[in-house]
Regions:
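Acidic, surface-exposed loops and disordered segments
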Residues: 1-170
Length: 170
């Protein structure tokens, strides 16, 4: 049932880095998003899968991992994602891209959970640095999200809001 996937889909920030992902696996996840609805069927989103160690390291350097944990630079070596999907928007086609990106990102994450994977949707990105490294033309494409993926080391859990109404993560 879909609700079971939703309940398993948490924001995982630590992974078994030695459990590699292939570009083919990432492409399968992307294909799930490819067939989701898009605003006026513009299909403005493009996806860049990354699964090799060298490129993964460069992508990692461009990400901020947890806004509420100011002193945490992200997962340590050995606990980093084994793959990423960079979500791009074709600026010539993009209208209401934030809706489309949300639909696509959630679809990819649910497909990942179905395969026993986990991930984290990241929007705090050094976009200039990432575009430069990946050779993305920022006149034509915007980098809006990076989906970090792998075999989760964290145990996802649901918690109730704090007594003070706080929703900060634990």
């Amino acid at each position: 049932m879909l609700k079971d996937l939703v309940l398993k889909n948490r924001s995982y920030r630590r992974f078994y880095q030695d459990k590699k992902l292939s570009v083919e696996t990432l492409t399968e996840l992307i294909d799930c998003a490819r067939v989701t609805p898009s605003t006026v069927n513009s299909q403005a989103l493009k996806f860049k899968p990354v699964a090799d160690d060298e490129t993964n390291a460069h992508v990692f350097e461009c990400l901020n991992w947890a806004g509420l944990l100011k002193d945490w630079p992200g997962p340590e070596e050995g606990e980093r994602p084994s793959g990423y999907i960079v979500v791009l928007c074709d600026l010539a086609l993009g209208r209401n891209k934030y809706y489309d990106e949300g639909i696509a990102a959630q679809t990819i994450m649910l497909a990942a959970v179905e395969q026993g994977l986990g991930g984290c949707i990241l929007g705090s990105i050094n976009k200039e640095k990432l575009a430069s490294y990946l050779g993305i033309d920022t006149e034509k494409y915007s980098i809006d999200l990076v989906l970090a993926l792998g075999s989760p080391k964290d145990e996802g859990r649901l918690t109730e809001d704090g007594a003070d109404g706080s929703t900060a993560y634990y």
